Regions:
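C-terminal transmembrane helix and the adjacent membrane-cytosol boundary/short C-terminal tail
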Residues: 32-33, 45-49, 183-198, 210-211, ...
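Transmembrane alpha-helical segments of polytopic membrane transport and secretion proteins
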Residues: 1-36, 64, 108-113, 282-299
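Transmembrane-helix boundary motif in ABC transporter permease subunits
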Residues: 66, 89-120, 133, 137, ...
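Membrane-interfacial helix termini and adjacent extracytoplasmic/periplasmic loops
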Residues: 18-24, 64-65, 132-171, 205, ...
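Short membrane-interfacial helix/loop motifs at transmembrane-helix boundaries
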Residues: 2, 39-78, 242-243, 290, ...
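Transmembrane alpha-helices
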Residues: 35-41, 118, 122, 126, ...
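Non-cytoplasmic
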Residues: 45-53, 178, 219-254
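Interhelical loop and adjacent transmembrane-helix boundary motif
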Residues: 17-30, 67-76, 238-284, 289
Length: 299
């Protein structure tokens, strides 16, 4: 019998020995082999389609001037501005609501708390079309609000199909993406710092501004970037609700499927991707992600 087994020691597995820093440094070929599946997936489902989309832009009648066309054409430019404004507004509203609610949920224990948290995060499991349908059931022609206003005032209040309905739909599916990050940041806040600030005479407002918000800021920034990027590219909710609103994903869909204007659809897709990528890259740079942090030695 093996000596290691007699002494009650188990040998490290082959995979764990490969994953140690020393093995990785000694065997770069192992890392290369392990990276191949990921590289194949990235190439097949991202790089190759992206290259094809970029080529389609140049194949249009305007050539590479298609990018200039979408920035000067009134319809495309208005759609881009509307999408940016909508995404920014939804992001700001989600951050404000989730900062308040998330901090409250972390610092208070009450009956039904877990149910409330589950309800707030439920939209994560819904596709965009379901979210749009729920907004229609709330504020559509046969919705709850329309029925109540018809009974009370004799006319239906319908706003599911305009900018307000789309805003509510975007906000609904954005809340879970923000509140989870806010709650994670709130759990790490040091209550002793708040007590120290109060003991030094700081008002509640100053404690919030100088202690609580700086502690929540990393979670707010990262979740805000994800919320903005998600809202920029949201299609299902816009497809269900945006009958009179030309947000960028809907314009891309219309140009590609109905007008067969593939070069313009490709150029709009590239612009949309660059905007969301720039937003996420700026957040990574601002928060310092990826930078090496000094490690303090200890006993």
């Amino acid at each position: 019998m093996d000596l290691d087994l007699k002494e009650g020691r188990s040998r490290p597995s082959l995979l764990s020995s490969f994953l140690t820093p020393r093995a990785a440094a000694a065997s770069p070929a192992i890392l290369t082999v392990l990276l191949i599946p990921g590289l194949v997936i990235v190439a097949a489902f991202f790089l190759i389609p992206l290259a094809r989309v970029a080529v389609e832009v140049g194949n249009g009648p305007e050539g590479w001037g298609t990018y200039l066309l979408i920035l000067t054409n009134a319809r495309y430019l208005e759609s881009l501005i509307q999408t940016l404004a909508m995404s920014a507004g939804v992001t700001m509203m989600a951050l404000v609501l989730c900062a308040v609610v998330g901090l409250f949920l972390v610092r208070n224990r009450f009956a039904g708390r877990s149910i409330l948290i589950g309800t707030l995060t439920l939209p994560l499991s819904f596709p965009g079309t379901v979210v749009g349908f729920m907004v229609i059931m709330l504020a559509g022609r046969q919705g709850v609000i329309g029925g109540l206003t018809d009974a009370a005032f004799g006319s239906k209040l319908v706003f599911a199909y305009d900018i307000a309905g789309l805003f509510i739909g975007y906000l609904y599916f954005s809340i879970p993406r923000v509140i989870l990050a806010v709650m994670a940041s709130a759990e790490k806040l040091d209550l002793q710092l708040e007590e120290a600030a109060r003991s030094l005479g700081a008002s509640r407002f100053r404690v919030i501004c100088d202690v609580i918000l700086p502690g929540l800021m990393p979670g707010l920034i990262s979740s805000g970037a994800i919320c903005f990027a998600t809202a920029m590219g949201a299609f299902g909710t816009a497809f269900t609700l945006a009958t009179d609103i030309d947000v960028l994903p809907m314009v891309i869909y219309t140009e590609f499927t109905r007008n067969a204007n593939i070069p313009v659809a490709a150029a709009l897709s590239i612009v949309l991707g660059l905007i969301t990528w720039a937003c996420l890259a700026a957040v990574r740079s601002f928060t310092g992600e990826g930078k090496s942090l000094p490690v303090r030695g200890g006993a």
